[in-house]
């Protein structure tokens, strides 16, 4: 086991110390990623709420204006929601987890830093379309209770490890914080989405 770990460290060090040209103005990267983390909702008067596991997967493009700045857009299948929520029906009341599936489009300014510009920090708005919503413990479709769109702020930090002239390994932490109430009818304080995730993926250099 110790030999395997040593070998992996040597390989990773070789990739990170290899000299490659930095991205320049006009360069474009295309990426794919998967991620896993947690989601919840924020509200001043929500009694029942806990973190729920959340999966996401998506594609991204990164258009460079310089070796420091680029415009990054993503298209993501995004699981959101929360655990230990309250659901009332005509016949009964339940404590259940809520799973909200979104197709999310963040548009972010991407700042590249570090000696090799292999670290990045991005931030910008996102819009999400609600593809489906369920109360999972009782297998009930609850999409009609929620707005079809969600708006908020997306941000992330990560690193890209150059594997070859045209391929990078991506490791990042990203988060989204909603600005709008997700419920169609809500007499109390607004309930907003909140999601954070660790992602891994690959970026392909197109130009």
Locate predicted features.
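Short glycine/proline- and aromatic-enriched beta-strand/turn motifs that initiate or cap beta-hairpins
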Residues: 20-63, 71, 203-207
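Outer-membrane beta-barrel channels and translocator barrels
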Residues: 25, 66, 114-116, 162-166, ...
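Transmembrane beta-strands of outer-membrane beta-barrel proteins
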Residues: 28-32, 71-73, 105, 119-127, ...
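Outer-membrane beta-barrel "beta-signal"
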Residues: 33, 161-163, 192-207
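Transmembrane beta-strands of outer-membrane beta-barrel pores
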Residues: 36-40, 77-81, 127-131, 175-181, ...
């Amino acid at each position: 086991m110790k030999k395997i770990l040593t070998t992996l460290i040597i390989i990773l060090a070789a990739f990170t110390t290899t000299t490659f040209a930095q991205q320049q103005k006009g360069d474009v990267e295309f990426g794919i990623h998967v991620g896993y983390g947690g989601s919840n909702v924020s509200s001043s008067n929500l009694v029942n709420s806990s973190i729920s596991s959340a999966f996401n997967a998506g594609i991204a493009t990164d258009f460079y204006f310089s070796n420091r700045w680029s415009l990054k857009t993503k298209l993501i299948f995004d699981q959101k929601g929360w655990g230990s929520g309250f659901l009332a029906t005509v016949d009964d009341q339940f404590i259940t987890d809520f799973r909200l599936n979104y197709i999310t489009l963040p548009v972010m300014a991407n700042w590249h830093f570090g000696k090799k510009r292999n670290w990045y920090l991005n931030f910008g708005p996102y819009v999400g379309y609600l593809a489906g919503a369920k109360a999972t413990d009782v297998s009930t479709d609850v999409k009609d209770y929620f707005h079809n769109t969600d708006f908020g702020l997306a941000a992330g930090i990560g690193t890209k490890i150059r594997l070859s002239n045209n391929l990078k390994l991506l490791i990042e932490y990203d988060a989204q914080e909603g600005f709008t109430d997700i419920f169609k009818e809500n007499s109390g304080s607004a309930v907003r989405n909140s999601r954070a995730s660790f992602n891994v993926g690959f970026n392909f250099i197109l130009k």
